[in-house]
Each structure stands twice: as C-alpha cells, then as structure tokens.
C-alpha cells in the first residue's frame, strides 16, 4: 500500500511539473522556422503594432517581421552591429550599437541619433541589452564580448562590466552594479518592481528590487541558469535562452523548455497584434511559437 501511495504521488508530481507547459503554449503548437538566411540573429523588439524588429549582428543589419503577412524586410543596413533592442513609448527603436560602444535611437525611417557614448568619459565596452521601464528609465548591460567583426578598437574600455541606469530624458549613465561577470540579457516587470539580469559567466539570473529613484536593492539569485536574452509574459513567467527557450515562473520554478534545432538561441520577445507570438532569434534563423500567454 505504501509503495502504491508513493508511486501515485510521484506520478502526480510529474504531471504537475509538466502541466504549466501546456498552460502557456497554444494547443498543438511547436516552434516554426520563418526564415534562415542570416549569419547570427539577435535583439528582437516589438513595436506598438506587433511587428518585430531583429538584428543580423555580424551583417550590420536590422530586419522587420510583419506580424500580419509574415514578410521580413530590411529596416537598415547601418545598425552599429546592434545587439539588444527595445521600443520606447514614442515608437523609437532603442538599440545597443555594440561596435560603436554606444546606445542609439532609430526613428522609423531608419535614421539614428546617439543617446549614450560613455561612462565617466570612457567609452563603453559594447552595450549588450536594454530594457525601458514605463516611466522612461533605461537599464543597460555593458559586458565585454570581443567580436571578430569589430572594426573599432577591440580593447576593453571600462574596468568593469557594468549594469547601468539612464534617467528619463538624461544622457549620463549611473552605475548600478559594478560586480557582475558579463551581464547580458535584461528585463523588468511591467509594474516596475523587479529587474532581472542574466550574468553570463556566473551562469545565473539575478533579481533586484527597483526603487522609486531607479536604484536597485535586494539582489538575489533567481535561477541557477544562465541566459542570453530574456523576456517576460503577463503571468510573470521569465523566458531564458541559450539551449532553446526555458521558462521559469515568477517564483523561480522551471515550468517549460522549448528545444530549438540551432546551435544557439540568442534572444526572444512576444510579438503579434495580441502579443501571443513568441518570436525567437536562434543562430542563422528566426522562429515563432503561438502561445496562450501574452507579452507586455
């Protein structure tokens, strides 16, 4: 009797562990490759319409995926080798211009202006990813990942790999955390309470409390797993990348994993008119996955 009870409990626990995956993905849906003609895709960002912009970083290009037609068109071939991107409230595409050590803002004609060039009069290492809070605050990671396609000075520019804050309308970065080992993907909660940061070399995800002045407190390890880019859904689930896409609930429990048949899955965001299409950048390709949950 005891053995049967233990077996029943084990089966129930397994079912419960698997159930959340079925609760976030639309029935019968699996990742679908929509294009595969790139060198290395990165930085997906969704605009107000639901279209997704993404980079082909080695080829210095940004592309736009039309959420209605599925068509992909070139947005610009002068991207500053942009990595992570995010749309601001005014509809500008904010991009981490990795090769130029800068943060850029693109209008919808593909013209850019420079938002940030340095910290304390020294160039940044190479901005990697950015998240914008609802109040217009920017949070930016600046690790040092030397690229073989850089044509600029490839030396490390900053003594640390920093996590930075940029106040709304400001142009001077504020250091938030100088102790990180290759900070990478970054995303915050829509209520502005928490910030998640991937620490690549430490192979973990950190969570901070965001204060009213934009500063961070109460740093904690959220998950013992690294990530490249990240995103969040309307239930507070966090989507990590690298070996496919792995999903953690807001309590830090792993609830799903979506294998992607590529060497590396670099980044992810929610697109589509209803923000229910998970858009995945993975090596030379991009994929979509229809979800039950929605992006923010």
Feature locations, PLM:
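Sec-dependent signal peptide recognition
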Residues: 2-8
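Sequence-structural signature of mature extracellular/luminal beta-sheet repeat domains
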Residues: 16-296
